[in-house]
C-alpha cells in the first residue's frame, strides 16, 4: 500500500490521483480535538491554574493541529524571553536556584492569538471541500 498526503490535492494530476483507491479529507480539528491538542501540548508547560484548555480550544477555532502546536511553543518561548529580558535575570550560579520563567496565562495566549493567524484561510477550506466533493473523498 502507498499512503500520500498533500496540502494541495487539486494540484495533483488526474493520472497520478486515480491510482489512489481512497481519498480522505482531514478537516480542521473540532472543538474537542482542539481541547485534546491543548491538553497534550501544554502538559509539560508551566501554566497558571486559571488556564483552561476548553477555553483555549474555543479561542483558537479555525486553527490547525500544527497551528496549535506552534501557539504552545510560542507561549513557552514568550515566558523564557521575558525571563532573559527581565532586570532580575542573572546567569546561573552553582549552589543557587536559577530563576524560573513565569507561568503561562490566558493573557499570554490571547496575545499570541493577535500575533499568529490560522494557517488555513476560509478560501482554502472552500477549495478543500470542493475537491473533497469532486473526488468523493471520505
Give the positions of each predicted feature.
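Eukaryote-biased feature marking scaffold/signaling PDZ-domain proteins and nuclear chromatin regulators
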Residues: 7, 21, 29-33, 48-51, ...
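Glycine-rich loops and low-complexity Gly/Arg-rich segments
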Residues: 27-30, 48-52, 127-130, 135-138
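Conserved AAA+ ATPase core "coupling" helix
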Residues: 1, 13-43, 52-55, 70
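Conserved NTP-handling cores and scaffolds of large molecular machines
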Residues: 16, 24, 28, 41-49, ...
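Conserved AAA+ ATPase "sensor/coupling" helix adjacent to the nucleotide-binding pocket
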Residues: 35-47, 55, 59, 74-82
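C-terminal engagement/docking regions of AAA+ P-loop ATPases
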Residues: 1-3, 10, 57-72, 80-138
Amino acid at each position: 500500500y502507498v499512503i500520500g498526503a498533500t496540502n494541495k490535492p487539486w494540484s495533483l494530476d488526474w493520472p497520478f490521483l486515480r491510482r489512489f483507491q481512497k481519498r480522505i479529507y482531514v478537516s480542521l480539528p473540532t472543538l474537542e480535538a482542539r481541547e485534546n491538542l491543548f491538553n497534550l501540548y501544554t502538559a509539560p508547560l508551566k501554566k497558571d491554574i486559571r488556564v483552561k484548555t476548553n477555553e483555549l480550544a474555543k479561542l483558537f477555532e479555525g486553527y490547525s493541529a500544527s497551528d496549535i502546536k506552534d501557539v504552545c511553543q510560542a507561549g513557552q518561548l514568550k515566558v523564557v524571553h521575558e525571563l532573559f529580558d527581565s532586570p532580575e535575570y542573572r546567569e546561573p550560579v552553582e549552589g543557587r536556584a536559577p530563576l524560573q520563567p513565569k507561568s503561562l496565562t490566558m493573557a499570554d495566549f490571547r496575545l499570541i492569538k493577535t500575533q499568529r493567524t490560522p494557517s488555513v484561510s476560509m478560501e482554502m477550506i472552500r477549495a478543500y471541500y470542493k475537491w473533497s466533493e469532486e473526488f468523493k473523498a471520505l
